[in-house]
Amino acid sequence: MSHQKESKRDNQHTDKEYVEKLVKLNRTAKVVKGGRRFSFSALTVVGDQKGRVGYGFGKANDVSDAIRKSIEKAKANMVTFPLKNGTIPHEVQGKFKGSSVLLRPACSGTGIIAGGTIRAIMEAAGATDLLSKSLGSSSAVNVVKATFDAASLLMDGKKIAKSRGKTLLDVWG
């Protein structure tokens, strides 16, 4: 019995190191014979503010269950954003269906200049300075997926040096 309590405490401790942000909560209604039956969908972003971030989409008949499911999926689908001094290393553009997201590095002190969806992702990732522009479709799900597509195109200094056949000092100077 006491062993189970310890493992529960460990799980609670790991939950506190993540920042959870609700991006979108949607209510849908199905009309049935007795009236309307509501269901909920939630889109959340989870990050450790050290460069690792993930997103999840959950559906349920209750708001709290939908949020819980989306957070679990977000923790399972974490990716790494290579951050350098609180910003991204270079400009990048990601696309998903009708949405396109442009991410640009910024000088320290600029802050995160972004819309709500991109801002939630970057704050969860731990970025402090960033410029962004969302183009095309403003659907929250599409913007999130376009942002993660942009993240997959980001290269840190080691990857850039390896692709050019140079050392890290040659690339960053």
Curated annotation (Swiss-Prot):
GO terms for molecular function: rRNA binding; structural constituent of ribosome. SUPFAM superfamilies: dsRNA-binding domain-like, Ribosomal protein S5 domain 2-like. Residues 18-81 form the S5 DRBM domain. It holds the Pfam family Ribosomal_S5. GO terms for biological process: translation. Keywords: Ribonucleoprotein, Ribosomal protein, RNA-binding, rRNA-binding. One of its GO terms (cellular component) is small ribosomal subunit. Coiled coil: none annotated. Belongs to the universal ribosomal protein uS5 family. The N-terminal domain interacts with the head of the 30S subunit; the C-terminal domain interacts with the body and contacts protein S4. The interaction surface between S4 and S5 is involved in control of translational fidelity. With S4 and S12 plays an important role in translational accuracy. Part of the 30S ribosomal subunit. Contacts proteins S4 and S8. This is Small ribosomal subunit protein uS5.
